[in-house]
Every structure is written in structure tokens, then in C-alpha cells.
Amino acid sequence: MGQKINPLGFRLGTTQSHRSLWFAQPKKYSEGLEEDKKIRDCIKNYVQKNIRISSGMEGIARIEIQKRIDLIQIIIYMGFPKLLIEDKPRRVEELQMTVQKELNCVNRKLNIAITRISNPYGHPNILAEFIAGQLKNRVSFRKAMKKAIELTEQANTKGIQVQIAGRIDGKEIARVEWIREGRVPLQTIEAKIDYCSYTVRTIYGVLGIKIWIFVDEE
């Protein structure tokens, strides 16, 4: 049987870069990793609680963390930064305070920057949130997948594959449904592929959404 590998980790150092940039002593490594997870969860929870657009999407494509001895630099790549920047200084400061409180970092400065990404629907995380929103509103899964593919086509991508697994439409037996448009060369390391897996809780149970987007050939 073919073994599935995470397309992002498979391409690290060629077409993908690390989302966390820092060094640590081997014994301290796990602490740094836990800290990163806390930061990411804290930001996502803050955005979920305070900023909601009609479709219920957070619009975060990715969060990059760079650490130095006296500074933690966090860059949030958002598809719809208006959500966080409407009353910008106050919102960002509030988020900074929340993260600082969560981390309890006294001797390190925390800096948060927000970057807008063009073509938000060309990013799998934002697309997965869109599909999750549709499934929660009981839209048929095929309709949701086709709509997602239409949105990515507007973002000038070369190919997309969407997979939904679980008790689809409340059926007794769980199954996997997928749809592909264009090319998605998972075996080619030079192919820049964006990927995300997303869990959505519907009234029928938990569904898993996986999205592969073929952005460009290096």
C-alpha cells in the first residue's frame, strides 16, 4: 500500500519553509514546542471569540513564530485582516496582552505583526474553514466541494484536491469522498504544494477535511 506523507514536511527546505524559527538546547526543545502551540491556540481562540464574519471564518492562513533571547516575533498571515485591523491599535494590543498573559513571559518582549495575503482562497486553511462553515449549515458536501474549487480557480492555482471523510450527510457508515481539479503532483518535491487537514464538528459527528493545493512549479 502507498504510504501517505505530509506534503509540507516532505518539502521542507525546498519549496516550504519552517513556520517556527528558533534554536534551543535539546533538553529545552519540548518547552519551546509547547510554547509555540500555546501561542497559536491563543491567537486562534482570540480571533474566534472576538472577530466573526458572517460565514464564521477566522481567515488565518498561517502563523509564523521567530524567537530570540529577548524577543518573540509573531507574524499572522490573514486573508481578511480587516477583521483584526478595524480598530487596529486596540485590537492588536489586546491580542498581545492575551498572548503575554498566556505565556507568562516577563523578561521577553512580544511583538505581533499582521500581514495581508492576496488571494485568500488560494490557501488551504481558509478554504477548509469555508467548507466547514458550509457543512455546518447542512449544505450538501458535493456542493460545498465544488464551490471551494470555484473559489480556488479565481486565485490562479494550478490544481486542487479536496477530501472529506466521516459520516457524510449523516449516513450510518463513514466513508471518504474526494474531488480533484487540475494537477496535484504529490510525488514531485519541486512542486509547491500547500496542504491542511481540518476537523469540523457537525450535528452528525466529526468530519475530517483535507485540502491539497498545487500553487506553482519551482
From Swiss-Prot:
Domain KH type-2, first and last residues per copy: 47-118
Keywords linked to the UniProt accession: Chloroplast, Plastid, Ribonucleoprotein, Ribosomal protein, RNA-binding, rRNA-binding
Pfam families: Ribosomal_S3_C (PF00189)
SUPFAM superfamilies: Prokaryotic type KH domain (KH-domain type II), Ribosomal protein S3 C-terminal domain
GO biological process terms held by the UniProt record: translation
KW Cell membrane (keyword) present: no
Domain of life from the UniProt record: Eukaryota
Compartment(s): Plastid, Chloroplast
InterPro entries (alphabetical): KH_dom-like_a/b, KH_dom_type_2, KH_sf_prok-type, Ribosomal_S3_C_sf, Ribosomal_uS3_bac-typ, Ribosomal_uS3_C, Ribosomal_uS3_CS
GO cellular component, one term: cytosolic small ribosomal subunit
Keyword Metal-binding appears in the UniProt entry: no
Molecular function in Gene Ontology: rRNA binding; structural constituent of ribosome
Main location: plastid
Family, as annotated: Belongs to the universal ribosomal protein uS3 family.
Binding partners and assembly: Part of the 30S ribosomal subunit.
Protein name, as recorded: Small ribosomal subunit protein uS3c
Gene: rps3
